A protein has these predicted regions:
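Conserved, structured core segments of small domains
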Residues: 1-91
């Protein structure tokens, strides 16, 4: 199952703890990328957050994975399930 996860930092919670959490994001992402759980990640230009594509086996695995994120308590999440888009001309 693939999910597009958009996360945006809650700037009203800005603190040194939040800054430290953001700095830990690459260490969080690395093992997930190597395991194939995060297949793409992008910065949202002009915003404080990111767009990540996760590939996991279940909704529960996605929830557990997001809960391990260093910014989990500082961000708002939008989660969009993704589906393959077959070519209607050449199915």
């Amino acid at each position: 199952m693939k999910f597009l996860v958009l996360w945006r930092m809650e700037l009203s919670l800005l603190s040194s703890e939040m800054a430290a959490a953001v700095a830990r994001m690459p260490r969080y992402a690395g093992p997930l990328e190597r395991a194939g759980k995060v297949i793409a990640r992008y910065h949202l230009v002009g915003q404080h957050g990111g767009a990540w594509i996760y590939e996991v086996s279940s909704n529960e695995e996605l929830e557990r994975t997001l809960a391990m994120s260093p910014v989990y308590n500082f961000a708002r999440y939008e989660i969009h399930p993704l589906a393959e888009m077959p070519d209607p001309v050449n199915p």
